Amino acid sequence: YNAPKGKNSFQQSSVSYLLGDSIFLINRSIIMRPQDNQNDFFEVYDYKNDSILRSFYASNFPKELLEHHGRDQAFQKDIAISNDCKKMVIAYRFLNMISIVNIEKEEINNLFTDGNKLNWEQVIEGTPKPYYTKVHCNNAYIWAMAIEGEDPSTFRSRLDIFDWKGNYLCKAHLDKWVSSFSIDERNQTMYAVTADDMLGRYNIKELLDQLP
């Protein structure tokens, strides 16, 4: 692919998403471009016309964290796109933050899920705590798999559910440490892969009944 703008964006990206007919969301990752010392940068790219429709930063990390040599670990994240491709959610593995993004309006809402500020000092000190392993979403809700416990031997997972305004709706404590999951709302079931590679199935009817 040799279109000038698109080629440059794709070469610098870590992942891209198809939002619609020839429209891509491209993430210029901090990890892929460590020399940039920038926050997570996204571009909405029109493949047919080789044009950048809009661009935005999905985070606003302090300079101390951006320049820290161990930031590659700090910025590990999972991204999910809503069914209508208008919204995006980012859950960070070692930061107590979930970013909710309206892709069309370039509106970003950063939620601090453990305390009222970003815990970047833990990363600088070399003692990062894991917060999230995976995130899923639909047009109505965000499902984030959080980690509870002080060390791997005691880790257990907690399923946090938010709406797109960032309201914390409800949670469910699980008996295992879950690394990945999927939600089957029609059958009111969650399928999960545990940290020791076991497949589990959870009945989430009671949880779904709590949602507005």
List each model region and its residues.
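Surface-exposed loop and turn segments in beta-propeller and other repeat-based domains
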Residues: 1-15, 51-74, 107-127, 175-176
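Structural signature of eukaryotic scaffold interfaces centered on beta-propeller domains
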Residues: 14-28, 71-86, 91, 127-138, ...
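Loop/turn-rich, solvent-exposed surfaces of beta-rich toroidal or solenoidal domains
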Residues: 124-162
